[in-house]
A protein has these predicted regions:
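A boundary/linker detector
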Residues: 1-25, 45, 96, 101-108
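General secondary-structure edge motif
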Residues: 11-12, 19-22, 36-37, 54, ...
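Short alpha-helical segments used as structural interaction elements across diverse proteins
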Residues: 21, 25, 29, 78, ...
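Short cysteine-rich loop/turn motifs with clustered Cys
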Residues: 22-51, 74
């Protein structure tokens, strides 16, 4: 299992990765592992190729590449959410769910 570190740079500092692209790849994989390959939005489990990393607070709106701002999402949910507010989008798409608490716990 890949260790879950705060951001890609920590993989370089801890000599787990030798290049920044390797560090980012390891960081993304560790996030998917942390969420058990399950989309935080729809709650379905996928194989690695169908998952992506979503910025809860989109980078286009000032969100950072930090552990507290990224979650595991299926490509469909990630694309559908786009740069919308995650909570507004999630409630419109799925209603109020227990998964909200999972996300809130992770980002706070």
């Amino acid at each position: 299992m890949t260790p879950l570190l705060p951001d890609p740079e920590h993989y370089l500092y801890n000599l787990i990765a030798m290049t920044s692209s390797d560090a980012k790849r390891l960081w993304r994989r560790s996030i998917k592992e942390h969420f058990d390959y399950t989309c935080v939005y729809c709650g379905k489990t996928y194989d690695l190729s169908q998952l992506s990393i979503d910025h809860v607070h989109p980078r286009s709106r000032g969100g950072k590449d930090t552990l507290s701002n990224v979650v595991c999402a299926c490509k469909g949910c990630n694309q559908d959410k786009g740069s919308n507010n995650w909570l507004t989008w999630m409630r419109a798409k799925f209603g109020i769910t227990q998964r909200e608490q999972l996300i809130l716990k992770h980002i706070n």
